[in-house]
Amino acid sequence: MPDGSEAAVIKVLGSIDEVDADQWDACAGTNDPFICHAFLKSLEDSGSVAPDTGWTPRHLILEDETGNLAACAPVYQKSHSYGEYVFDWAWADAYARAGGRYYPKLLCAVPFTPVGGKRLLIRPDLPEGSQRELKSTLVSGMVALAERSGFSSLHINFTNVDDGKICGG
């Protein structure tokens, strides 16, 4: 995968505990405490992020051919819009009036934290071209998960400009 020739293995995790903390943090970097493994783990361990609170972890990871983490993203299945700091209640209402079901939806974000930053986390030692390709693969994986699971939509909240461009924004 570092040269772009190997296939990435995408996995969906039900808990941040399913990924090695050091490997996650290697992708997350050290500049943003809200995307580090320990912070996301504390949200799960405290019960703040759990299915019964409307935040079901669905983290995406991409492993290289040796099983090492190359990319990851904090992703959640949401049954409401609380804790997102994006006020889409009117969207949900309009969706329902049109006969649709807005929830569950898929959200790539940091729970309860309206702080901008990267959401598509890539190992920094990979070449720039591979990093962009992996970010696109993460987004494609989220879209596929949303479609396969019957989610109404995919949201990526408070991302940085570079990640926004990958998403088409």
Question: Predicted segment positions?
Answer:
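N-acyltransferase acceptor-side catalytic subdomain
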Residues: 1-169
